[in-house]
């Protein structure tokens, strides 16, 4: 395996493990990883308690786990599309050379 591939693999491992090590167990009870939607909703209610949303979602997932699953599925589909694009362009470039 080439040295640049080893460096890339090590970089991915470090980038994956660094947040897990840095934030292991910190802030879970305070909603540290709560998300932007919840924080924005809380801020809107703090600024204007009488605010009423313009519309409601037509379907809401029955649990947080299903919501996370749908989000992960959306991310996986996006990653597959991006990976296909890069693979297609690399194969096209290799065919020219």
From Swiss-Prot:
Signal peptide: none annotated. Keywords: Cell membrane, Cobalamin biosynthesis, Cobalt, Cobalt transport, Ion transport, Membrane, Transmembrane, Transmembrane helix, Transport. One of its GO terms (molecular function) is cobalt ion transmembrane transporter activity. The chain crosses the membrane at residues 6-26, 68-88. Pathway: Cofactor biosynthesis; adenosylcobalamin biosynthesis. One of its GO terms (biological process) is cobalamin biosynthetic process. It is found in: Cell membrane. It is a multi-pass membrane protein. Pfam families: CbiN. One of its GO terms (cellular component) is plasma membrane. Belongs to the CbiN family. Part of the energy-coupling factor (ECF) transporter complex CbiMNOQ involved in cobalt import. Forms an energy-coupling factor (ECF) transporter complex composed of an ATP-binding protein (A component, CbiO), a transmembrane protein (T component, CbiQ) and 2 possible substrate-capture proteins (S components, CbiM and CbiN) of unknown stoichimetry. PANTHER family: COBALT TRANSPORT PROTEIN CBIN. This is Cobalt transport protein CbiN.
């Amino acid at each position: 395996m080439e040295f640049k591939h080893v460096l890339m693999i090590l970089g991915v491992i470090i980038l994956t493990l660094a947040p897990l090590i840095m934030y292991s167990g910190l802030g879970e009870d305070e909603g540290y990883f709560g998300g932007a939607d919840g924080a924005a909703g809380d801020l809107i209610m703090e600024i204007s308690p009488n605010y009423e949303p313009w519309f409601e979602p037509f379907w809401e997932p029955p649990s947080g786990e299903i919501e996370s699953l749908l989000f992960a599925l959306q991310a996986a589909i996006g990653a597959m599309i991006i990976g296909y694009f890069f693979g297609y362009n690399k194969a096209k470039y290799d065919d020219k050379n």
